[in-house]
């Protein structure tokens, strides 16, 4: 029995990749009992996606297999296993728990706080405004409109104050978004996931495994939703290239000039 574990402080997005690995081992019959050790964020994962309980296990004297922090599509996991995992373990509860939220035309996730500390600026940073504006400009072109005044926009973020003080005013000024059409959600990791899934047309994702999983689920549940992602992951891996499964997504270049070491 392969029992995967991590000791690197995985959060929810990383933990889902861990569960995907156990599912992939079972799916391809590498080990039909492969599982994930019940540590870290497993309680949140089980609360959000109850069926994942089947993939967790206690140690029970089994050999523990460490799991890498970064997972690359096509190398560490296949698209087939990913779609199967989403459908079998995540999709039902996601649909149920997101149904209470009104769908927004555009959903935007803004991740800031853990990118603004020390070396993380260099390893992960890029110009957020530049990236978001590129996505919104492409939406305008697709919709053939001069502004986004008739669109609803949901924002989730780990830094609501910054969004209120800096981002929202620019969105109103540059894109004509009406204040009543901008829904800034309270900070709540669990609910933010389901709020982002309640997306009618466009999802703009930061460089975040958490939000990539929303995109994965939208791809199998509502493939007409267009997902935008940055063409960047981290300078620590693959020359910074995006490593998620980006099938049918729009990958946008990012501006890292102010974050590159001299």
Predicted regions and their residues:
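N-terminal pre-catalytic "stem/leader" segment of glycosyltransferase-like enzymes
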Residues: 1-36
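Aromatic-acidic/polar surface patches that form glycan- and anion
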Residues: 7-15, 121-128, 207
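Donor-binding and catalytic core of enzymes assembling or modifying cell-surface/extracellular glycoconjugates
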Residues: 8, 12, 145-238, 243
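A conserved amphipathic alpha-helix that caps or lines the catalytic cleft of carbohydrate-
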Residues: 22, 26, 136, 215-218
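Short alpha-helical "patches" and their helix-cap loops
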Residues: 31-44, 225-236
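Secretory-pathway luminal glycosyltransferase catalytic domains
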Residues: 34-147, 160, 244-245, 252-254, ...
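Short, conserved active-site loop motifs that form the nucleotide-linked donor/cofactor pocket
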Residues: 177-182, 247-250, 257
């Amino acid at each position: 029995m392969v029992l995967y574990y991590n000791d690197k402080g995985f959060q929810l997005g990383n933990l889902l990749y861990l569960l995907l690995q156990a599912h992939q081992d079972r799916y391809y019959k590498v080990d039909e009992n492969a599982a994930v050790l019940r540590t870290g964020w497993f309680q949140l994962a089980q609360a959000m996606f109850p069926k994942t309980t089947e993939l967790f296990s206690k140690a029970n004297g089994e050999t523990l297999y460490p799991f890498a922090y970064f997972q690359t599509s096509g190398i560490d996991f296949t698209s087939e296993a990913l779609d199967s995992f989403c459908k079998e373990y995540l999709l039902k509860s996601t649909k149920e728990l997101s149904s209470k939220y009104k769908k927004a035309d555009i959903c935007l996730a803004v991740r800031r706080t853990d990118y603004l500390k020390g070396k993380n600026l260099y390893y992960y940073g890029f110009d957020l405004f530049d990236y978001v504006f590129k996505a919104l400009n492409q939406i305008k072109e697709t919709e053939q409109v001069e502004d986004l005044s008739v669109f609803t926009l949901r924002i989730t973020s780990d830094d609501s104050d910054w969004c209120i003080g800096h981002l929202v005013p620019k969105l109103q000024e540059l894109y004509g978004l009406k204040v009543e059409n901008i829904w800034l959600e309270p900070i709540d990791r669990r609910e933010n996931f389901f709020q982002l899934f309640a997306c009618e047309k466009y999802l703009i994702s930061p460089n975040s495994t958490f939000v990539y999983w929303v995109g994965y689920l939208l791809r199998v549940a509502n493939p007409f939703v267009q997902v935008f992602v940055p063409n960047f992951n981290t300078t620590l891996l693959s020359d910074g290239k995006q490593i998620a499964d980006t099938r049918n997504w729009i990958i946008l270049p990012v501006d890292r000039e102010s974050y590159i070491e001299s």
